[in-house]
């Protein structure tokens, strides 16, 4: 059948674009994963399991607050901005970006206030002493950059996945480099917090710089303007879309960063550290689907929904993601235990049982 002919599948230009963009993201993800393991390895070897767990909890706490509060503004930009660009309507694209940018700013402000305000009530349960409490409060100032996804949406809408790949490789490189320095010079907990903080700050700033540069190249000016309610008037269904994606992402976040924080509260920092290592390996199996999904969304928005092309594109992408995901999962099961022992040491081998 033609639907199962490999050559016929790859004759689809949209499918080839998805694979190309996924390859960009995949290459950076492989680099990011290796550098991320290096950063975690240095932290695990440079501190006791308990303090390693505290570091993981601090990072997960800030991310969980961000995940609960933030809107998936990158989806908004792709959903409404991509058709505007396709139809050569820069003013509508400007409205979409302005609305998305305003949501990021408002939600980021709410998140940072909420994150710092909640911290004193949770500090004892999270295993924070006086020094680590203030470092955790400092880390919470990163929440607005974690909550902002407008620049990611812009880069996807203008098909600059190469720039996304550069950013996704740069941030873990800086984190790994800082972690190596903190481990080598025995800077301890404070050194690792500062290294991770700086890498996140620089990585988040890069996204905004890349996005602003692409907007200037396309003569789209004054898009990064606080204009929440006025710009929303020109985007039909914008509010219902952002609320539905926000709720869906909040539910998703409960399984990820929030679960690490809960493990820390219930079982202690050392258990949270083991859980983080296990989740790092476990999530590798879902990475292919995530990468293809991020590439699929902009392409499907360019297709006519009245035809069968979007559906066929979804089936092809899903089958490809599932096949690669199964192979990655098998690899994790086979090499996971010796890899954990090699990278983190035998004191963290219990993490494999959690996988």
Curated annotation (Swiss-Prot):
Q: Which InterPro entries match?
A: Poly_Biosynth_Transport, Polysacc_synth
Cytoplasmic side, ranges: 59-100, 156-177, 283-323
Bilayer topology annotation: Multi-pass membrane protein
Q: Name one Pfam family in it.
A: Polysacc_synt
Q: Which UniProt keywords apply?
A: Cell inner membrane, Cell membrane, Membrane, Transmembrane, Transmembrane helix
What is the annotated localization of this protein?
Answer: Cell inner membrane
Q: Highest taxon of the source?
A: Bacteria
GO annotations of cellular component type? plasma membrane
Residue ranges, Periplasmic side: 1-37, 122-134, 199-261, 345-355
Q: Which residues cross the membrane?
A: 38-58, 101-121, 135-155, 178-198, 262-282, 324-344
Kindly indicate whether the keyword Nucleus belongs to this entry: no
Protein name per UniProt: Inner membrane protein YghQ
Origin organism of this chain?
Answer: Escherichia coli (strain K12)
């Amino acid at each position: 059948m033609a639907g199962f002919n490999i050559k016929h599948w790859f004759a689809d230009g949209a499918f080839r674009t998805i694979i190309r963009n996924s390859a960009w993201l995949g290459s950076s993800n492989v680099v990011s994963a290796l550098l991320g393991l290096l950063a975690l390895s240095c932290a695990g070897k440079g501190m006791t399991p308990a303090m390693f767990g505290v570091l993981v909890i601090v990072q997960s706490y800030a991310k969980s607050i961000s995940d609960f509060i933030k809107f998936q503004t990158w989806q908004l930009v792709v959903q409404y901005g991509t058709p505007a660009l396709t139809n050569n309507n820069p003013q509508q694209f400007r409205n979409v970006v302005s609305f998305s940018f305003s949501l990021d700013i408002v939600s980021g402000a709410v998140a940072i206030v909420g994150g710092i305000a909640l911290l004193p009530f949770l500090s004892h349960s999270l295993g924070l002493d006086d020094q680590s409490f203030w470092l955790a409060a400092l880390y919470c100032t990163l929440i607005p950059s974690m909550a902002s996804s407008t620049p990611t949406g812009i880069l996807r809408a203008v098909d600059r996945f190469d720039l996304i790949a550069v950013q996704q490789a740069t941030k873990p490189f800086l984190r790994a480099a800082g972690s190596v320095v903190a481990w080598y010079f025995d800077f301890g907990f404070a050194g690792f917090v500062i290294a991770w903080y700086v890498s996140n700050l620089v990585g988040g700033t890069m996204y905004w710089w890349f996005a602003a540069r692409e907007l200037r190249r396309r003569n789209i000016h004054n898009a990064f303007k606080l204009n929440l309610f006025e710009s929303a008037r020109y985007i039909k269904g914008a509010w219902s879309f952002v609320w539905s994606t926000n709720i869906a992402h909040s539910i998703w976040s409960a399984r990820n960063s929030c679960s690490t924080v809960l493990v820390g509260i219930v079982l202690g920092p050392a258990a949270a550290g083991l859980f983080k290592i296990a989740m790092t390996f476990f999530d590798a199996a879902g990475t292919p689907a995530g990468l293809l999904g991020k590439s699929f969304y902009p392409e499907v928005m360019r297709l006519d929904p009245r035809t069968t092309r979007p559906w066929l594109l979804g089936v092809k992408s899903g089958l490809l993601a599932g096949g690669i995901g199964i192979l990655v999962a098998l690899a994790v099961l086979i090499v996971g235990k010796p890899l954990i022992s090699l990278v983190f040491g035998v004191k963290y081998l219990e993490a494999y049982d959690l996988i």
